[in-house]
Amino acid sequence: MNENEGISLGELETRPFSEGITRFTKEQAAYYAEQKEKDRIKALKIPYEDSKVREYLRRYGEPITYFGEDALARRQRLQQLMIEKSLEGDNPLDVDQGASENIEKETYVQGSHELLVARKKIALYSLEKAKLRLKKEREISEIPVPEIVLSGKSSIEHLQKAELMGSQIGGERPIAIVRFSNNGNHFASGSWGGQVKVWNSDNLSEVQLFRGHTDRVSGLDWYPLCQAWDADSEQLTLATGAADNTVCLWKASQSTPLLRLEGHLARVGRVAFHPSGDYLVSASFDTTWRLWDVHTGVELLMQEGHSEGIFSIACQPDGSLVSSGGNDAIGRIWDLRSGKSIMVLDEHIRQIVAMAWSPNGYQLATSSADDTVKIWDLRKVSLAHTIPAHSSLVSDVRYIESGVNRFIATSGYDGCVKLWNPLNCSLIKSMVGHEEKVMSVDGYGDRFISSGYDRTIKLWYP
């Protein structure tokens, strides 16, 4: 063979892969196959609501239920059926083609004059609030790095000593949500019995009982301009949402609703005040979230955008953005000033059940029934971190500020309350005390409150 001519492909020596490379290749193939299967299942858009699961089974000509079959088993049966149809080449969405077409079609509805005024007010408010936030961030950035590192390390060591310090029966039914007041001296709870209570956070004594809901309370938020609990106050104090399809506004001096906001066609999930105190947002299983004027009770906006019910909703600290999370496993971030959806959060594989904005204004934490917490970065418009937070559904997630330090608190159906370092997503402390699943958590400084299916409210601190 002439050296200048080189060699042909047929003359190349072939050698078998080593055992290590072969094993790695097989593991890679298995991983990609698993991811492909997850993507296939996600693309099927299997409904979560049992009524829709039954409807899909009926359209497939299958029994809508078997003896002893619960909702989860019924959904798994539908999932397997839809996968089989997909593998056979059938389009599983053909059973609901009309609904699919409606989902894909964009529609625009002219807003009211009141909504236009509200958007302008929100724009002006958010610009001023952003200036204050950036000023605070600059002040923190001027602190020497060693001092911040030492402060963070000291705070983590302090939180690692947190223990169960008090427990109280919160009602006759499971306690779905707890939230600290703006100064931390009190907290409020909402139960499946429809009761809303305010408690002293020092001794866990009940100080007020509100009655107005006829079904499970699942959303609760303190009025941002209410700095301290005053039993004689005529000022707006709380907002709650419940499975009776209503949102209620409360003042401390009255045990019945100050205002009842009606309009949702299905159960209401989370509710959140706008930081300005002028507006309230509510999420519902009617697949919409709504914007309300808290002074007049007028519905300013009914926003669609999810294919399944919406449970979680949260306002960004500046007040310019709102995030919503649905049973369709999709989250969306909306610009309240323009009404546009500016980011889609599509990395969860099961429904999103809670959301919390970081005080920095550009990070959002979402928790899901897929057992994870995900941190999203709006600056990069992408997912920043995934925390395998619990071994079961992550029922709540909250950002907690303690001086210049920030932490994340989560609760899960595995019975745990956990604290996390948001800088590296490392676990700081896992606290166990509830007999059954933990349904909610909140924190103020170094104090944490949790509520559970066991009907108890528990207080934790170092």
Curated annotation (Swiss-Prot):
GO process terms (BP): mRNA cis splicing, via spliceosome; mRNA splicing, via spliceosome
GO molecular function: U4 snRNA binding; U6 snRNA binding
Main localization category: cytoplasm
Cellular location(s): Cytoplasm
Taxonomic source organism: Schizosaccharomyces pombe (strain 972 / ATCC 24843) (Fission yeast)
Pfam families xref list: PRP4, WD40
Cellular component annotations (GO), alphabetically ordered: cytosol; U4/U6 x U5 tri-snRNP complex
Keywords: Cytoplasm, Repeat, WD repeat
Lineage: Eukaryota, Fungi, Dikarya, Ascomycota, Taphrinomycotina
Repeat region (WD), residues: 170-209, 212-260, 263-302, 305-344, 347-386, 389-430, 433-462
Protein name, UniProt field: Uncharacterized WD repeat-containing protein C227.12
Annotated PROSITE patterns: WD_REPEATS_1, WD_REPEATS_2, WD_REPEATS_REGION
